[in-house]
């Protein structure tokens, strides 16, 4: 933990006391509302139809898209808790807040229901996006007027130019559960860290906050180094998931919560130098660096979604036995005196 947040950024501070902390939103679920009949969130939509074979029709392929819209998020239970009942009853949904609510009135937030085992066992559940959020994806046509090269998921689970993290905050509505909540974050090297935010033993909205105990407010006390800039200094963080722990001594069954957003206060890794040349626009090294990994992840995502689409077609459509057949048989039966 100390290495992740103290060395990351301290080593990238570029010896410039002009770097300053700023606040940014890592993700805001109220902005991840599905649109129209598709239910997709257009700015975060990914097309995985290229992973489908020729057996699929053009209509099927046109529907092979997925986004970060709230209902697309998944809950992954600990392996010891993955029973059919627990998995079926653990889900994510878009939850509207009442118009007259004191906070976030009229907005839509992420609603979470987790069904833990009824018996005493240590367990956890991870609320995770439907795919690994890419750091340098581009929305649609990279030449489009509003497209930002490599910036499709900026503010949708990705923050760039992140040096030393000072504080992290999650706005969440609790229902007096004793479960502990933590965040799973990943840096530009693929290293994942878990940040414990606190317990959900409160009722109503609350801002759970983590403060970096290793954050140095005095520049004189920082380990300042001069390091090469582009393309070396490209630190970032992205959200891997939201983890809720259940202690074996706690009561099992359902827990319910609602999540609005996650915010971060951090030092810039590199101060905007108002350079006369846009390095990334010319060389694209950062995008190329992630392209192979991203393509692998998207291929894996596409294969999974194609298999799910195929499985959905094979599933039984009937909710119950047809009552028409027994009724018709009864009508044909000869009358008895």
Swiss-Prot record:
Q: Which InterPro entries match?
A: FlaA (IPR006714), FlaA_Spirochaetes (IPR016369)
Keywords from the UniProt entry: Bacterial flagellum, Periplasm, Signal
Pfam families given for it?
FlaA (PF04620)
| Main localization, broad class | periplasm
Signal peptide annotation: 1-21
- Role description: Component of the outer layer of the flagella.
Protein name, per record: Flagellar filament outer layer protein
Species assigned in the record: Spirochaeta aurantia
